[in-house]
Amino acid sequence: MPRRKFAGKTDVGLKRKNNEDAFFISPDQHFCLAADGVGGAAAGELASKIFTESTIETFTGNSDRSGKEIKHRIQKAFRLANDNILKHVTQNPDHKGMGCTAELLAFSDEGFIIGHIGDSRTYCLRNGQLEQLTQDHTFVQQQLEAGLITRDKIKQHPLRNVIFRSLGLTKEPELDLLKGKACPEDLFLLCSDGLTDMVPDDQIRDILRSGIDIHRKVEELIETAKLAGGKDNITVVLAAVY
């Protein structure tokens, strides 16, 4: 099995008082995640925490690395987190609307599997080319796919932050599952929109291509987002394949 190295960090940014993002890395269980809370300060932060804890619980104590098992565990983690968020809202009605976006990347014996919901993203840098693997679950993405707006209009669109999928939104989480082969020298990026709203893809690609250490790349991406305005919490997780 190829070796992997992980690095990650979350930053409150320059405009927010609290951080509703979360990330977690488990080298032993071969997974990493990023989440971005929605629904207000304390509630959003708690939703991201619930997703993190639910994933840790789901992956702990199982050594089966088959693709089938990893896919099952990802689905289970999303369902458990969704159930726990909805249960919390039932018990705490003032937190109605609480939820989070979620990215979960796990490596199996055959390659990688991604669970995705919301507008956080997972990218892969392969052979110097950066590819966005996930599709945003947003109003503007729907409009773009329907040919009703052009990509250059997204950043200025008044409804650009409207998401139609997140954990805690419906009884059954509508996640996307993606899988593929993991090749030597692949570099996976999981991030919240605090990065991608501030830093264009070509600049992200150039930082990921650079020869600096993986931990320094995380720092560089976050600092670049802050230099561009740092309007939101910023979370960056990298997984390098060797």
Describe each region flagged by the PLM.
Residues 1-242:
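PP2C/PPM-type serine/threonine phosphatase catalytic domain
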